[in-house]
Structure formats: C-alpha cells, structure tokens
Amino acid sequence: MTTANLLVELFVEELPPKALKKLGEAFAAALTESLVAQGLVHAQAAVTHFASPRRLGAHIENVLERSADKPVSTKLMPVSVGLDADGNATPALLKRLAALGADASAVATLRRESDGKAEALFMDSVAKGISLGLGLAKALWESLDKLPIPKVMSYQLADGWSTVNFVRPVHGLVALHGTDPVDVRMFGLTAGRKTHGHRFEAAADPIVLKDADSYAQQLESEGAVIANFAERRAEIVRQLEAAAAPLGLVPVEDEALLDEVTALVERPNVLLGQFEQAFLEVPQECLILTMKANQKYFPLLDAAGKLTNKFLIVSNISPADASAVVGGNERVVRPRLADAKFFFDQDRKKTLDARVLGLAKVVYHNKLGTQGERVTRVQAVARAIGEKLGGEALALKADQAALLAKADLLTDMVGEFPELQGVMGRYYAQHDGVADDVAFAIEDHYRPRFAGDDLPRNPVGVCVALADKLETLVGLFGIGEKPTGDKDPFALRRHALGVVRMLIEKHLPIGLNELVSIAFSAFQQGLLGQAHTDVYLFMFERLSGAMREQGYSANEVDAVLSLNPIRIDLVPQQLEAVRAFAALPEAAALAAANKRVGNILKKAEGEVGASADPGRFVEAAERALFAALDEVAPRAAAAFGSGDYTASLQALAALKAPVDAFFDQVMVNADDPALRANRLALLNQLHRTMNRVADISRLAA
C-alpha cells in the first residue's frame, strides 16, 4: 500500500504560553495514537511535534493512504440457539444476521467453534480499510478532546451561527500526505497546503507548502518561524550564552522561564539591556524575581553568582536597529525595580520583632487559629527540639528564630512577592542586628520546599524547619485535613518528606515518634483529635517511598521498617546492611527459616520464654543451635551496638547449618509441655538475634 509522510497543522490565535509545550506534545501523541489504532500508521513511526505561539503541528512518517482490510470474526450465538434440530436457522439467528447486513444465504458459511462454554456460531467477514481522510478527521477530533487545555474558549465560526469550543480560535488547517492535501474539514475549515509565518517578519504570506517534509524548512526560510519547540528553545539558549559570554557573565538558570519565553516567540532574538546601578542595593532575589516574573527577562550574574545591572531580553522581532526595542524594555523595567526598592526601604523602617504582634490578626486556619497562635506553637516545638539536639543555647536561638520566622508575611515586599517569604525575613533580621545563624534560620525554615531542594544551613534552621513542618502536619491531621488520593492542598506529603530528609541527611539522633509527641503537646488540649498514630504512619510511608526511590527494593525496605526503628537517620545504613546480607549464600535459607520461626511463635499458646534452659535439651541439634547462638549472639549484638549493621547481620551466616539441622531433627511442638516450652524459648532467642537490624524473613521469596 502507498505510504507517505503526513503533516498536520492547526493555525490558531496566540496560545497560552505556560501550556504550549504540553499542548504540542499532547497533540502529536494523541493524533499518532488514534492513527495507529485505525491501522493507518505503525506504532513505531517517527513523530515530530511542532508548537509555536500560533500553531500546533505534527509530522508523522510512513502513513498509509488507506488502512488494510481486516478479517473480522463475529460471535453470533450458541449453536443450540441458532439452529433447530434439523440444522435450519432459527428466527433468532436470521434476525442477528439481518442486523449484520446478511441473510439466510450466509448460514451455510457460518463457522462452528467452542467459545469455552459451548459450541457457538461465528461469522467471518472482512472489514474494509478506512481512508486517510476519514481516519485523520477522526484522529483530529479525538486528539483535540484529549488536549490538556487549561481554559476552553467558545467562539463563532465564519458561517455566523456555528459555535465551537477550543483553547483559541482556529484560522487555518493544513493536512498534507506527501505532496497531496488530505480531504479533511473541521472548525469550518477545509484542509489545504497554505499556512502563515511570523506576524511581522515573514518574507511571504501565505506560505504555500510543497509537501509534508518541507514544512519546518519553508516556515523558517519564508515565514521567519522556528516551528519546532525544542529547536527554538535550543536557539534561545545558544543566543543567551553568546550574549553573556563576552561580558564574562552568565544568565540566571530557570527552566520554566526558558519554556515560557520559547512559547512567546516564533523566531527569537536576544538583546542586552541594563538598569541603574543604584537598584543593586535591593536584595538580588527581589530584582531577579521582578525581572523574571513580570518582564520575562534573564538577569545576568557575575562569576561569584552576584547580580549585575545587565539583563537579556528574548525578543520576537529582529529590527535593523535594536536600540528602540532595548530602550523600551529598559523603560518598562525601571518602575518595577523602583517599586522593589521602595518596598525594601519602607519595610526596613519597622523591625521584624515589632511586626510579630500583627500576626495575631492574620487567620491561619479557622479551626487552628491565627498565625500568631501558630508562631507560639512552632516556638514551643522548636525549643524542645533545640533542647534535645543542642541544649539550652540551641533552644534559645531556635525560639528566637521561630518567633521571627513568619513576621515578614506582614511586609510590603512579601505582600507583592509571596515567593520571597523567608528570604526577606533573613534580610530584615540582619538589618535589625539579629545574629546570622538566627537570620539564616528564618529563611531556611521553609526548606526543603521541593524535591531535591537544599536543607537548612545550620542547626537553628533545622530546629525551626522541623518545628514548622511538624506543627503543620499534626495540626491539619488533628482536624481531619488529611491528603486523599492525589489531593494534597496543604502539601502535607512534602512537609513529611522534608522531616524525613532532615532527620536522615542531618543525622539527627531523635526519634520520629518523639517528634510527633512534642508537636502534639504544643497544641491546646482538646483542639485536636487523636491523630498521633496517623501522623506517625503517614511519615513512615514517606520514608518508605523515599528509600525505594533511592534504589532499595520493596523487600529490603519492608525488612527494616517493619521493626519500626526509633532512629530513622540510621535506616540507610541498615538498608545497606540488609542488601549486603541478602548477597550471602546463606541468606535465602536463613530468611526462610526466620519466617518459619515467626509463624511458629505466633501460633504458640501462652507466653513464650525469653531464653532456653540448656539442661532440658534432649536432641543434639538443639544443643548445637543453642551453642551456635551463644557464640553468634554476642558478636551480632556488639556489632549492632557499635553501628556496624553489616557485620551484625553477616554474623548470622554461621547459624545456617545449626538452624537447618534443628528443623530437620527436632520436633518443636513436642508432647511434653516442658520440652515444647523450652524449644519455643530457644526459637524466641533465635528470632530476637536474627531480627535486631531487620526482619530478614521479609527477604524470603
């Protein structure tokens, strides 16, 4: 059958920039998926997606002009229902055949075959292939239904009465199969070979496409458009680096901003702008955020990462004289920077300490009170954690940092740029003469804010960050605001993971259960429901997920966490020990034996003794196991006590032979109650020795 490459383009009004990348990818993927399902293209066909501010497109290789005919087997009904005793068609069968467009003459061609329950009648036929025109129309509508459109527009078509819903009005439709247009109509448009280039700089309008493969090249040469999103993005990166390098500077790295400006321009032109040096007195985070969020500029940093007074503009036009474009952008950014400077100057007229009382007027949650009440709770938790980790000195600093941590929420700068909460608190605290470790703790108490984010830089910050997250978790769980499914409006999963990361990566010698108890004690009695266990288990789930993401298997993680370790900062070392143990030749047999021991002890009636009496042993195998335990247990315990979990587990390898012999030669559930109790006590000793680092029975297949 004839194949050729297919090009499809929707020419639209300006698409939402933050959604463009996903729209382009989703359009091409859904279009291809539908064509594959209809048999018009192979599942492995190469696909290129195009997305620019005014177009969505896809280029798909080796698309059929018509899909192949397909043999179809249709089950009709059981033979007993379709044929009478003489083998003639029943009315039920004739009615079913008529519904399929056949008559009584088809009865002789029906096939008999078992359907697994009874013998049934099947009709074999051939489904004619679908033309590309029909298939593409179906694929287009299906793909448009699947687009992740943030907000749909309703607009009227040119006929004056038809209304359609789409992300933006569609003004052109291209569908080329090789050199031939595909007969498709949608949005009141007939597909053709004409498209449009850059709004201002196209050399030709319209652009008449020669064939499907010429699309990208013709758009760039005749239309001044780089249609491929990835290529346009790469060109922006190249130009940014080329503009910054001669100055010895580097543009701020921001992947989201890069995607957004790629979605705002069709052919990028990077230009250099600058502002007055005086604005650099304002914290650079404020200036950078202002330029990125409001103007979509790329601020330039020096080799030390310090902001300079220069920035890069990604323009959509390339005039012979760019001074007007640069000058216009410099004029626009100046008031923005002036506002930031004004906010900074005004905010410093009032200390953070003086703002704290104002938090009593800010509602945090209608069931949990004000931000002022919350600050008091966070202070109490931070003090307690500080006392545990560093004594009175750390507790006092943690208390001060917790008191001031939320005060910057009442500043003009944070009111304008909420993203700067914490950051501005640090600057204002330093201006007020607060010690640096306390000031940095104010900024850092929000960390980690996202996966892979840095942790607090000093112990004071760690105390306040833990306190802030624990107070949030306990408070919201206590009033029933738990995450459900993919809904987590208060980012409680992120908070819990932050606590887990700090405990592990900062090697903090404090138990998770103790931290949860400290946090609950900070709340007024009767304010919260009984949610201690829920919070604890929720955080353990985050710990389990974090360890699996680091490459540990579910069995390895389960083996360690099933013992509910008090110190989760030791969990990674214990997991490494479990992994090393699992590699031993004796591991599988010992894991299976441990599982068997656990099952025996669970079924045992009454209380099982903690240790066996060697004087009651009858069999040589139980004496040998007791002797082996007497030799191995102290070594394993000593290694465990010194933190050498690998050695503690590996010491168990010596138990394989005596354990195997014990189960081969000894009847645990002996008729003599005293003998049975002694053997159960021996197994209890074995179980405790084997399960000190991890429950190795979880490693059993």
Swiss-Prot record:
Coiled-coil ranges per UniProt: none
GO cellular component entries: cytosol
Catalyzed reactions per annotation: tRNA(Gly) + glycine + ATP = glycyl-tRNA(Gly) + AMP + diphosphate
InterPro entries: DALR_anticod-bd, Gly-tRNA-synth_bsu, Gly-tRNA-synth_heterodimer
EC identifiers of the protein: 6.1.1.14
Subcellular location per the Swiss-Prot or TrEMBL entry: Cytoplasm
PROSITE patterns registered for this protein in UniProt: AA_TRNA_LIGASE_II_GLYAB (PS50861)
A GO BP entry: glycyl-tRNA aminoacylation
Keyword Coiled coil: no
Entry keyword annotation includes Aminoacyl-tRNA synthetase: yes
GO molecular function, one term: glycine-tRNA ligase activity
Main location: cytoplasm
The entry's keywords: Aminoacyl-tRNA synthetase, ATP-binding, Cytoplasm, Ligase, Nucleotide-binding, Protein biosynthesis
Subunit and partners: Tetramer of two alpha and two beta subunits.
NCBIfam families hit by this protein: glyS
Similarity comment: Belongs to the class-II aminoacyl-tRNA synthetase family.
Name of this chain's protein: Glycine--tRNA ligase beta subunit
Gene name per UniProt: glyS
